[in-house]
Amino acid sequence: MARRDGRTGQRSVWMMLAATVALALVLAACGSDGESTTADSTETTVEEGSILFNPENRKVSLTIGSKNFPEQEILGEIYAQALAAAGYKVKTALNLGSETIARKAVKTGQISAYPEYASTALTSFFGFKPEEVPSNAEAAQSKANIEFLKEGLQTFNPTPFASANAVGTTREIAEKYDLKTISDLKGVSKKLSLYGSPECRQRIDCLAGLEQLYGLKFKSFTPVDIGLRYSVLEKGQADLSILFTTDPQLAAESDKFVLLKDDKKVFPAGNVIFVHKRATAWEAGSGLELTVQAVQEGLTLKLMQELNARVELEKETPEEAARAYLESGGYIAS
């Protein structure tokens, strides 16, 4: 799907509001600034960029959460730092755990919002089958939003990029068993071990789908921390591992790892949606949606892979990677 350049599109949103926030700009120039407070109470000063600081937003406190892997933490930091730049009092509660834990946290008010994948919400929360998840990002977000509204939650428009689960292996294993698609596992899966996140066992877009829709039975399934999904392959602890299509290792180490084609479409791709309470949106005002939508526009697949690489391969912190994205896009001052 064609998208505008993130920086250009983002600025156009804010330019439309320039007339109504002129006072905010004056106050910002006089020294007002936003803060993003992380879960360990570390404060971060966010300088003014093209995101406009609105002093009225200082009345609103937000806690941004995330699930427990780098991409999620990067997204959580992007939202948190951008909202702090817009004037909100922001804390982070990142690395909460699985989608079930994050959903409970936002429903109970432990956090104000977190990034979720529309396909994950539809299949894991609301009982949709993989084939029932729309391939169109806006349609998937709309369906998820309808379901979330029943819980007092809502979402904003999705990110340009989408991510999906995938079955990966080493090139050595793929060549040994002539594996190109997931269906190719049919005759050999009983000889192979599979590693995945703890929640993978019950998810239809993970082990449950591989068993039910592909008819596969593995020698073993072992729950593993998401951060170890590649090391178990490299160390020979697993023959197969559940990976993500946005993983930077797939491009950086293509000589080592292979993704098997999901020929039966068990793993629907999911664009990210900002899940939050309706009451939060009401309290925060229009600046919440405008800020979230603005910083999302630049999040293409290539860009998200680059941000993931900064954290997973170059060992930057999610906070550092998020700030680099916001600065390079002109959202906040460098």
Give the location of each predicted region.
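Periplasmic-binding protein-like
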Residues: 152-154, 159-164, 248-295
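Extracytoplasmic "Venus flytrap"
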Residues: 43-77, 94-98, 199-202
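Short helix-initiation/N-cap motifs at beta->coil->alpha
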Residues: 92-104, 198, 219-231
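A conserved helix-loop-strand patch within extracytoplasmic ligand-binding domains
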Residues: 134-194, 278-279, 297-301
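Bacterial lipoprotein signal-peptidase II cleavage site
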Residues: 31-40
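A ligand-binding cleft/hinge motif common to bilobed small-molecule-binding domains
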Residues: 118-129, 140-144, 232-259
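Short helices/loops that flank or line small-molecule/ion binding pockets
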Residues: 77-82, 100-111, 127, 208-213, ...
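C-terminal motif of bacterial Sec signal peptides marking the signal peptidase cleavage site
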Residues: 25-29
